[in-house]
């Protein structure tokens, strides 16, 4: 699982996640959120991460610019090692999907695939 560090903030009057190194946040909904400005982690499985040369807006997912560092060809799939604002992200991509394996692109993950954790206690936060 990828664990991305960030901070719980308020944006336009709603709880939001500000990924460390990013300039903009995105809204999140937690049942019992920690205190404002608490460090939290976004957990996302490699198979739930996509990497594309460009990113269209989709209200059910979050898109960030990312750099491609390494591609491991594993036969039926490839493991993309990405740099997202200085944090390492892995994306498991099917080899049947045509991909450009170089240069910058966008990393995308759907809200439904996100898992939240308290950075200090490492306990899961209910969404």
Report each predicted region and the residues it spans:
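ABC transporter nucleotide-binding domain
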Residues: 1-12
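Short glycine-rich loop/turn motifs that provide flexible caps or phosphate-binding loops at active sites
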Residues: 5, 42, 74
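Glycine/charge-rich catalytic "coupling/switch" loops of P-loop NTPases
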Residues: 11-70, 88, 98-127
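Short aromatic-glycine-enriched beta-strand elements
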Residues: 13-17, 75-81
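Short acidic, flexible loop segments centered on an aromatic residue
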Residues: 84-85
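A conserved acidic, glycine/proline-rich C-terminal tail/linker
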Residues: 91-94
